[in-house]
Each structure stands twice: as structure tokens, then as C-alpha cells.
Amino acid sequence: MNEAVREDMSSNYDLAKTEADKIDAQIVETLKSGHSFRVEAGAGSGKTYSLNRVIEWIQANKWSDYSRKKQNVVCITYTNAAVDVIAERLAKDSFILPSTIHSFAWNAIKQYQKFLIDTVTTNDEYRADDGDFNQVMEVTYTLGHRYKENGIQYLYHDDVLKLFCALLDNTKFRRVFANKYPLILIDEYQDTYKPIIDRFIGHFIEKETGPQF
């Protein structure tokens, strides 16, 4: 590689980094304002880099506030591998929770056992092929296979998302949810289960209430 090519590549990198830093600064200012925002860019444009910069800023500037209130910032990403990458950058006791959408949805709804039991036992959509709804005492989600065993109804992956949507339509649940998760970051939001995104927009973003996204 000759010197001219090397200098040209270095110049392009510097320009790209300067532009990325400007965008990151704009994102931070939006975070400070409390308004929700969306970052749209093509593959390889640095969205993941920006996400990591935002996470670093939140961890450095919001620790005392969110930790004192026992609140969590959630970073929803598409794969478990991406969750692991983000987790490696966080302090062990961080209030930032990287998660897939399925894990996040289940953590948000799992304590509402009465609602879950009532819903799955009155709706054939959740019936396991090898069981019935008699004497369901608990609803849980582990490997994503739907079956019933020893009074426990195990949910399919999409069951969790649908039940989360149903609870998001409940006003009381939304109040509790918003208080627990004041900020939700969604990586690759266009690949996230659309009914959930629609509810985030309709119940929170359009009404300018609840979590910041």
C-alpha cells in the first residue's frame, strides 16, 4: 500500500469518526431531554458503536439516579450473542439489563401469575398438544416448548410475546412497567415483534408518557 492510499484511508476514517461523534453527541442531548428517538442507518454504518457509546454515557451519568430508585435501563437486542457482547462492557452490578425481547417480555410479566393462568386456561391458543388446562397452578417459560407437566404450563416463544402485548394494554400494568423501566433501548427495532413495537408507540411514545425509547 503506497503512502497516498494510506493517507486517503486515514482521512476517510477521520471524517467518518467525526461524523459518528456528532451523531452520538446528538443522541446524548436527546437522552438528556427525555424525548424518545430513533436512529436509522444502513448496515456497517456504526449503529452498534453508537449504541455502546450511549450505554457508556448512561452508565456514567445515570447510575446514582436509577440505582437509588431501583430502576433498570433495558437494552433489547436480537440475539443472545449480542446480549453477551453488551454484558461484557457493563459493571457487574450495573442497572443496565441487556436482553433479548423474549427474555425481557417474560421478566416483565412472570409475576402476574393470576393473569397468566386465567388467560392460558381460557384460550385454546395456548393449549399444549399433549395436555389440558385442568389444574394449571403455574405458568412458566424456559426452553420455548409448549407443554403441561405437574400442574405447570410451559409457554412457547410467541406465547410470551402475545401475553406481554395483552398486559401492555392494561393501564395498571403500564404504570408499574414505566416506573420500573424508565429507559428502553432497542437495537434493530425493525426486527422486533411488531405488535410490541406498536404498543410501545401507541401507549407511550405518541402520548409522551412512560419510558423513554
Language model regions located:
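Conserved RecA-like helicase ATPase core segment
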Residues: 57, 202-213
